[in-house]
From Swiss-Prot:
InterPro entries: Aldolase_I_AS, Aldolase_TIM, FBA_I. This is Fructose-bisphosphate aldolase, glycosomal. The gene is ALD. Keywords: Glycolysis, Glycosome, Lyase, Peroxisome, Schiff base. It comes from Trypanosoma brucei brucei. Gene3D superfamilies: Aldolase class I. The active site is at residues 198, 240. Pathway: Carbohydrate degradation; glycolysis; D-glyceraldehyde 3-phosphate and glycerone phosphate from D-glucose: step 4/4. Belongs to the class I fructose-bisphosphate aldolase family. Its main location: other. The keyword Lyase applies. It comes from the Eukaryota. It catalyses: beta-D-fructose 1,6-bisphosphate = D-glyceraldehyde 3-phosphate + dihydroxyacetone phosphate.
Length: 372
C-alpha cells in the first residue's frame, strides 16, 4: 500500500465499535435499568437548585438538609418496585444512608442501580447564537468516571440543551453539542458506566409542536451520527430526550395522543433499534401530564423497538417535597406522595395508567431556563 493511500485511510472515520472490557456489564446494566414497569429517579439537583426548592418550604440549604431530602426518597420502603436506577449528585455519592452505608452502596444492596451526573453545568457557546449554551466537564473526565465506578456507580448522565429561538437553533450548537455528547458517551463506556445521553430541546419558547418536532429530529439525528462516528456500544447506552411538545409560552397545549404520535414518530426516524431504552425527561410538565404523555406513548400504534420510560426529577418529587416540608413529622406524608407518583409512572410505562386514579390537580412545573 502506498504512503499516500495510508495517509488517506487515516483521515477516514473509523466507525468501529468501541472496544471496552466492560461491554457485557454495560449491556446487562442498561437492560436492568429499562426493566418493565420501572424508570429512573433524577435526584441530581445542584446545590443551587436545592436552594430554590427549599425556599418554597422555608428550609435552609445545608448539606445535612440536602442529605435528608435525598433520604426522603432513597430510603422509602418498597420504591425499588417502581425505580430501577437513581441519578445522584456528586455530593450525594459521599453521603450516608441511615444504615451507615454510602448511598451508592445502599442502593445496590436494594437492587437499584446508582448513577451519577458527570457534566459540570452549562456555559455560553461563543460560536452559537445569542443565549445558546454548551456543557462543561470533559477535562479530566476519565479520572472522574473511574472514581465513580469504584464508588459503586454503574451509569452516568450528561445534559446538553438547545433553546429554540425564531423557530430554530444554530447549526453551531447542534454540531458542537453532538460531538460533546458522543465523546462523553464513549469515555463513560471505557470506564464501565452506561451513558445516558441527554440532548434536551427545551420547552422554553413560543414555538408550536411542529417546530419542536423539526428541531428535535435534527438535533437527535446529529447526536446519533456523532455516536456512530465514535463507535458507541448502542446496547449499553440510553437516551434521555425531551418529549415533542409546544413551547411553554406559546399558549398551545398538546393533548396526550398528539404528543405521543409526534414524539414516537420522531424517535423512529432517527434512533437505532439497538438502543435498549428511551428515558424521557419531564422538562417542566406537571406531574400528571408527565404520566399521561408517557402512558400515551406506550399505547401509541407506531413501531416502538425501545423501552419508553421515565427519568423524572420534578415530576416525581414536587408533591413529595411539599408534603415533607423539611420536617421529621412530614416524612411519611412525603414518602406516600413520592410512592404515588412512582406508581403512576410505573403504570404509564406499562401503558396502564388511568387519569381517574391520579391526583385532581395538575400544576405546571415549568421554570424558564431551568438548570440542574
Amino acid at each position: 500500500m502506498s504512503k499516500r493511500v495510508e495517509v488517506l485511510l487515516t483521515q477516514l472515520p473509523a466507525y468501529n465499535r468501541l472496544k471496552t472490557p466492560y461491554e457485557a456489564e454495560l449491556i446487562e446494566t442498561a437492560k436492568k435499568m429499562t426493566a418493565p414497569g420501572k424508570g429512573l429517579l433524577a435526584a441530581d439537583e445542584s446545590t443551587g437548585s436545592c436552594s430554590k426548592r427549599f425556599a418554597g418550604i422555608g428550609l435552609s440549604n445545608t448539606a445535612e438538609h440536602r442529605r435528608q431530602y435525598r433520604a426522603l426518597m432513597l430510603e422509602c420502603e418498597g420504591f425499588e418496585q417502581y425505580i430501577s436506577g437513581v441519578i445522584l449528585h456528586d455530593e450525594t455519592v459521599y453521603q450516608k444512608a441511615k444504615t451507615g452505608e454510602t448511598f451508592p452502596q445502599y442502593l445496590r444492596r436494594r437492587g437499584v442501580v446508582p448513577g451519577i451526573k458527570t457534566d459540570c453545568g452549562l456555559e455560553p457557546l461563543v460560536e452559537g447564537a445569542k443565549g445558546e449554551q454548551m456543557t462543561a466537564g470533559l477535562d479530566g473526565y476519565i479520572k472522574r468516571a473511574k472514581k465513580y465506578y469504584a464508588m459503586g456507580c454503574r451509569f452516568c448522565k450528561w445534559r446538553n440543551v438547545y433553546k429554540i429561538q425564531n423557530g430554530t437553533v444554530s447549526e453551531a450548537v447542534v454540531r458542537f453539542n453532538a460531538e460533546t455528547l458522543a465523546r462523553y458517551a464513549i469515555l463513560s463506556q471505557l470506564c464501565g458506566l452506561v451513558p445516558i445521553v441527554e440532548p434536551e430541546v427545551m420547552i422554553d419558547g413560543t414555538h408550536d409542536i411542529e417546530t419542536c418536532q423539526r428541531v428535535s429530529q435534527h438535533v437527535w439525528s446529529e447526536v446519533v451520527s456523532a455516536l456512530h462516528r465514535h463507535g458507541v456500544v448502542w446496547e449499553g447506552c440510553l437516551l434521555k430526550p425531551n418529549m415533542v411538545v409546544p413551547g411553554a409560552e406559546s399558549g398551545l397545549k398538546g393533548h396526550a395522543e398528539q404528543v405521543a404520535e409526534y414524539t414516537v414518530k420522531t424517535l423512529a426516524r432517527v434512533i437505532p433499534p439497538a438502543l435498549p431504552g428511551v428515558t424521557f425527561l419531564s422538562g417542566g410538565l406537571s406531574e400528571v401530564m408527565a404520566s399521561e404523555y408517557l402512558n400515551a406513548m406506550n399505547n401509541c400504534p407506531l413501531p416502538r423497538p425501545w423501552k419508553l420510560t421515565f427519568s423524572y426529577a420534578r415530576a416525581l418529587q414536587s408533591s413529595a417535597i411539599k408534603r415533607w416540608g423539611g420536617k421529621e413529622s412530614g416524612v411519611e406524608a412525603g414518602r406516600r406522595a413520592f410512592m404515588h407518583r412512582a406508581k403512576m409512572n410505573s403504570l404509564a410505562q406499562l401503558g396502564k395508567y388511568n387519569r381517574a386514579d391520579d391526583d385532581k390537580d395538575s400544576q405546571s412545573l415549568y421554570v424558564a431556563g431551568n438548570t440542574y
